[in-house]
């Protein structure tokens, strides 16, 4: 069972008020500090203490003493929390990022070429918007030397506010660029890749959730490069199964939609408009709408899920015949996002890969830096697509 140690120390936010001697002077008469100590326990009252320091003081010993006094008054656990963001945000100092998650800053000639190509064609990528840790590897070409990126269509602004995601949000984002499908197709064709992942923000402000625009992008790519394999990582379209049909029959090769986390944590992790059953319905319908369609999903680990809960989610996914599962470590984009509860070891990820394939998934990509649009297993997926296509012709 996964375990999380709560923080045992309070944290403090300090606001400073100043009073000048007169408008010609740059010296301050005094500094007024208000120290806010917040407990992660919602039943515990906030404590505030004021401290005044004279302008002549040369050190912060009085302030340190006051902080120590406040700290001494707190004995209950502090599990994390940012003001106004709830008790599940903030950095947990007891959960340190391990060495296996440290990545070099992305750089290189090929990386810059991809970046400039995307900028020139006004295209968005989930690589940048979601702060993907694998951006350097993918844009530089990885092991096969072929650079690729995961294109994000329907703009760069999401109508939802999932608590794990770094993509910017708005209730009324700008309308989709009508030239985006064609520009995307041109960019991908120029890269020379034979497998591409397209994803999108959620667009609850559009009647079909953006499925029509998404489908146009797929069709444009197939026109420019008929032999390219396209994986679409989609939203849930608010559970609109007709929207799912539109995309499934657009010419894509892999239909992907992420359940993100186990059933118990859905409401904590995802926007209220998303949900476990709704995501399962979308994945199930993609298979029904087009028999033989390869389906894929992803789950983040390290959010506080238990082994039994993860096994239950994996069983539910196999019950609707999902083919591919990716498992990766949740990484907190900013202190305002959900706190990492645990850094799962590479050995445990190996265990989940073996377990997933033992219960019937055709492929499981499992590792700390694996993401739903990651290249891991790309060759295997290509083989699956070709096999599925051959069966449909026979």
Swiss-Prot record:
SUPFAM superfamilies: Radical SAM enzymes (SSF102114). It is found in: Plastid, Chloroplast. Keywords: 4Fe-4S, Chloroplast, Iron, Iron-sulfur, Metal-binding, Plastid, S-adenosyl-L-methionine, Transferase, Transit peptide. The gene is LIP1P. Binds 2 [4Fe-4S] clusters per subunit. One cluster is coordinated with 3 cysteines and an exchangeable S-adenosyl-L-methionine. [4Fe-4S] cluster 2 binds at residues 158, 162, 165. It is an enzyme of class 2 (transferase). SMART domains: Elp3. It catalyses: [[Fe-S] cluster scaffold protein carrying a second [4Fe-4S](2+) cluster] + N(6)-octanoyl-L-lysyl-[protein] + 2 oxidized [2Fe-2S]-[ferredoxin] + 2 S-adenosyl-L-methionine + 4 H(+) = [[Fe-S] cluster scaffold protein] + N(6)-[(R)-dihydrolipoyl]-L-lysyl-[protein] + 4 Fe(3+) + 2 hydrogen sulfide + 2 5'-deoxyadenosine + 2 L-methionine + 2 reduced [2Fe-2S]-[ferredoxin]. Residues 141-362 form the Radical SAM core domain. It comes from the Eukaryota. Together with LIP2P and LIP2P2 is essential for de novo plastidial protein lipoylation during seed development. Disruption phenotype: Embryonic lethality. Belongs to the radical SAM superfamily. Lipoyl synthase family. [4Fe-4S] cluster 1 binds at residues 127, 132, 138, 373. Pathway: Protein modification; protein lipoylation via endogenous pathway; protein N(6)-(lipoyl)lysine from octanoyl-[acyl-carrier-protein]: step 2/2. One of its GO terms (cellular component) is chloroplast. This is Lipoyl synthase, chloroplastic. It comes from Arabidopsis thaliana (Mouse-ear cress). Pfam families: LIAS_N, Radical_SAM. Residues 1-36 form a transit peptide.
């Amino acid at each position: 069972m996964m375990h999380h140690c709560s923080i045992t120390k309070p944290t403090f936010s300090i606001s400073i008020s100043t009073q000048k001697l007169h408008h010609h002077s740059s010296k301050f008469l005094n500094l007024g500090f208000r120290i806010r100590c917040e407990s992660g326990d919602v039943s515990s009252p906030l404590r505030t203490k004021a401290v005044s320091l004279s302008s002549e003081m040369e050190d912060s010993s009085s302030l340190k003493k006051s902080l120590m006094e406040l700290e001494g008054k707190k004995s209950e656990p502090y599990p994390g929390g940012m003001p106004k963001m709830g008790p599940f945000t903030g950095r947990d100092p007891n959960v340190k990022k391990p060495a296996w998650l440290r990545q070099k800053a992305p750089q290189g000639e090929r990386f810059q070429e991809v970046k400039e190509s995307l900028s020139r064609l006004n295209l968005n990528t989930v690589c940048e918007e979601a702060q993907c840790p694998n951006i350097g590897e993918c844009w530089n070409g990885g092991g096969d030397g072929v650079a690729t990126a995961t294109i994000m269509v329907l703009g760069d602004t999401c109508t939802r506010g999932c608590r794990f995601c770094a993509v910017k949000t708005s209730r009324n984002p700008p309308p989709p660029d009508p030239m985006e499908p064609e520009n995307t197709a041109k960019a991908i064709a120029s890269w020379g890749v034979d497998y591409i992942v397209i994803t999108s923000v959620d667009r609850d402000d559009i009647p079909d959730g953006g499925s029509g625009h998404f489908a146009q992008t797929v069709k444009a790519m197939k026109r420019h490069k008929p032999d390219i394999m396209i994986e679409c990582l989609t939203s849930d379209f608010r559970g609109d199964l007709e929207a799912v049909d539109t995309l499934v029959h657009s010419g894509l090769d892999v239909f992907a939609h992420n359940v993100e986390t186990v059933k118990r944590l859905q409401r904590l992790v995802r926007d209220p408009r998303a949900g476990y059953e709704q995501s399962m319905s979308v994945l199930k319908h993609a298979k029904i709408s087009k028999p033989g369609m390869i389906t894929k999903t992803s789950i983040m680990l390290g959010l506080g899920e238990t082994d039994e809960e993860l096994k239950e989610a994996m069983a539910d996914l196999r019950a609707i015949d999902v083919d591919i599962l990716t498992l990766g470590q949740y990484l907190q984009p900013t202190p305002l996002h959900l706190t990492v509860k645990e850094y799962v070891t590479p050995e445990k990820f190996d265990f989940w890969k073996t377990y997933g394939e033992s219960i019937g998934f055709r492929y499981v990509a499992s590792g700390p830096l694996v993401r739903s649009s990651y290249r891991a297993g790309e060759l295997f997926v290509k083989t699956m697509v070709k096999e599925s296509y051959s069966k449909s012709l026979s």
